[in-house]
Amino acid sequence: MYAVFQSGGKQHRVSEGQVVRLEKLEVATGETVEFDSVLMIVNGEDVKIGAPVVAGGKVVAEVVAHGRGDKVKIVKFRRRKHSRKQQGHRQWFTEVKITGIQA
């Protein structure tokens, strides 16, 4: 059984027991989070597709940790001008463990 849900402007395909990194959520570590915007639920041959979301569909997860991703380097270079600009970015994330999928 797996589900596709939306969080932080992105869609995630998950199954029970899976650990997923999402955009940062303002929830404390160890708390439970419910995602109501479930787009699709598949249980063997039974497929439920929402228009746009599945009615009564829910993905339940437990917050495992918060952190920051790897550094992404941004470089702006102007040729022949002896000019260069360097910048870095580390995106915040929340790691959750999927504990249940309800149809």
UniProtKB/Swiss-Prot annotation:
It comes from the Bacteria. GO terms for molecular function: rRNA binding; structural constituent of ribosome. One of its GO terms (biological process) is translation. Keywords: Ribonucleoprotein, Ribosomal protein, RNA-binding, rRNA-binding. GO terms for cellular component: cytoplasm; ribonucleoprotein complex; ribosome. Belongs to the bacterial ribosomal protein bL21 family. Part of the 50S ribosomal subunit. Contacts protein L20. HAMAP family: Ribosomal_bL21. This is Large ribosomal subunit protein bL21. It comes from Pasteurella multocida (strain Pm70).
